[in-house]
């Protein structure tokens, strides 16, 4: 993509993403500045490209994390419930936490990262604690092990849901866990085929509207047996 680049450090990377119009809001830029990718990506943390993090999983490119924050930012408010499916390294989950915390403190806020690989769950918690132990200690950011394709009913309904891997078709179970006024963004399409980042918005009456945002290429949303 035209904006792909390598930052000298985390702040330089965020500056470049902002200069190229990938990051539009100061609040998104600040959340990403405060969440240094070096804690979450052992290889090339400031390169704008996916990087391996173990278990056959990659951390998404920084520009895709920026897009996710921009598309969801109006739903990231104190007291909101957020679900990050396929949370992997824990990076974007931490960005959600910091974005909301900067808006104000509310005891009802819950940001849940769900990951199906036990080792990645362990590693992401270690990443978060290396970054800032107070995030997990707050009880408002949770990392859980489970099949994210089924969402996480204990904290539903969610004001915002992000999915970090491609669903083969419309993710009905996740849509069912959206709150009224909530938004889901998810890559949809077959592995190796045409995929699109799709946005699902649920209105006050439960009606869902889908908007196709852009063409993407993601690994498929799976479980350990896939």
From Swiss-Prot:
Effect of substituting residue 60 to Q: Loss of catalytic activity
Pfam families (UniProt xref): PCMT
Positions of S-adenosyl-L-homocysteine binding: 57-60, 65, 89, 115-116, 147-148, 222
Entry's Gene Ontology BP terms: defense response to bacterium; methylation; protein modification process
Gene3D superfamilies: Vaccinia Virus protein VP39
EC number, UniProt record: 2.1.1.77
MF (Gene Ontology): protein-L-isoaspartate (D-aspartate) O-methyltransferase activity
Keywords recorded for this protein, A-Z: Cytoplasm, Methyltransferase, S-adenosyl-L-methionine, Transferase
Main location: cytoplasm
Its job: Initiates the repair of damaged proteins by catalyzing methyl esterification of L-isoaspartyl and D-aspartyl residues produced by spontaneous isomerization and racemization of L-aspartyl and L-asparaginyl residues in aging peptides and proteins.
UniProt similarity note: Belongs to the methyltransferase superfamily. L-isoaspartyl/D-aspartyl protein methyltransferase family.
NCBIfam families referenced in this protein's UniProt entry, alphabetically: pimt (TIGR00080)
Protein name: Protein-L-isoaspartate(D-aspartate) O-methyltransferase
Annotated source species: Drosophila melanogaster (Fruit fly)
């Amino acid at each position: 993509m035209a904006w792909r680049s390598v930052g000298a450090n985390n702040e330089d990377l965020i500056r470049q993403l902002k200069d190229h119009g990938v990051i539009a809001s100061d609040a998104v830029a600040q959340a990403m500045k405060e969440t240094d990718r070096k804690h979450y990506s052992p290889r090339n943390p400031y390169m704008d490209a996916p990087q391996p993090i173990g278990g056959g999983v990659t951390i998404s490119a920084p520009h895709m994390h920026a897009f996710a924050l921009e598309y969801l930012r109006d739903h990231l408010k104190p007291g909101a419930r957020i679900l990050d499916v396929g949370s992997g390294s824990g990076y974007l989950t931490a960005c959600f936490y910091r974005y909301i915390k900067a808006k104000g403190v509310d005891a009802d806020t819950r940001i849940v990262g769900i990951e199906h690989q036990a080792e990645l769950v362990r590693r992401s918690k270690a990443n978060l604690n290396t970054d800032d132990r107070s995030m997990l200690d707050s009880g408002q950011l949770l990392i859980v092990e489970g099949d994210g394709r089924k969402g996480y009913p204990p904290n539903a309904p969610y004001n915002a849901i992000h999915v970090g891997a491609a669903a083969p078709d419309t993710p009905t179970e996740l849509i069912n866990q959206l709150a009224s006024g909530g938004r889901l963004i998810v890559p949809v399409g077959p592995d190796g085929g045409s995929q699109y980042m799709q946005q699902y918005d649920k209105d006050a009456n439960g009606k869902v509207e889908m908007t196709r945002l852009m063409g993407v290429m993601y690994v498929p949303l799976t479980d350990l047996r896939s």
